Amino acid sequence: MGEVEISARAYGKMCLHASRYPHAAVNGLLLAPATGSGECLCLTDCVPLFHSHLALSVMLEVALNQVDVWGAQAGLVVAGYYHANAVLDDQSPGPLALKIAGRIAEFFPRAVLIMLDNKKLVTRPRVPPVIVLENQGLQWVPKDKNLVMWRDWEESRQMVGALLEGRAHQHLVDFDCHLDDIRQDWTNQRLNTQITQWSGSTDGNA
């Protein structure tokens, strides 16, 4: 399988989701352009799903349907799944992660499964705190690290560090939050704007 590129937005929101609920397992969906071509799968965004109702299939169905509709309007498809376990030193995908990732792969064969490495989830990690897996046959196996690309790793790590220091993770909304209060925006447009402004300010200082 080909290269995977992880954008600052997708990476940032995964980390902020895990940081908002550090003692809970969290999960979410990874999005890519529907018109993507070539060998590289570009993960441009993600949608945080749950921190307390991970195993409830009814809520998962509701979330998947809403993300599918919203993604189609934005020209995006569900291209992967991310998961952070509740246990600090556990980076292995459990049955739930494998089940959801497998379902996504049925509709998008190039889908990836990203496990967050909790031990490396610090403010500014030296190396990306992610383990990217790809579907080979009936198994999810670690992807060659040389095929996992970053649009700008240094920018991504600095951005997440700045957002965490500014406590932006407290404003992240996942589907659990939305289902508790439908006024809360699970697309996280406020956070997207912060990420865009941060990236723009660093470009301007370059």
UniProtKB/Swiss-Prot annotation:
It is found in: Endoplasmic reticulum membrane. The keyword Endoplasmic reticulum applies. GO terms for biological process: protein insertion into ER membrane by stop-transfer membrane-anchor sequence; tail-anchored membrane protein insertion into ER membrane. GO terms for molecular function: membrane insertase activity. The keyword Membrane applies. CDD domains: MPN_UPF0172. It is a peripheral membrane protein. One of its GO terms (cellular component) is endoplasmic reticulum membrane. Residues 4-139 form the MPN domain. Keywords: Endoplasmic reticulum, Membrane. Component of the ER membrane protein complex (EMC). EMC8 and EMC9 are mutually exclusive subunits of the EMC complex. Belongs to the EMC8/EMC9 family. Part of the endoplasmic reticulum membrane protein complex (EMC) that enables the energy-independent insertion into endoplasmic reticulum membranes of newly synthesized membrane proteins. Preferentially accommodates proteins with transmembrane domains that are weakly hydrophobic or contain destabilizing features such as charged and aromatic residues. Involved in the cotranslational insertion of multi-pass membrane proteins in which stop-transfer membrane-anchor sequences become ER membrane spanning helices. This is ER membrane protein complex subunit 9. It comes from Mus musculus.
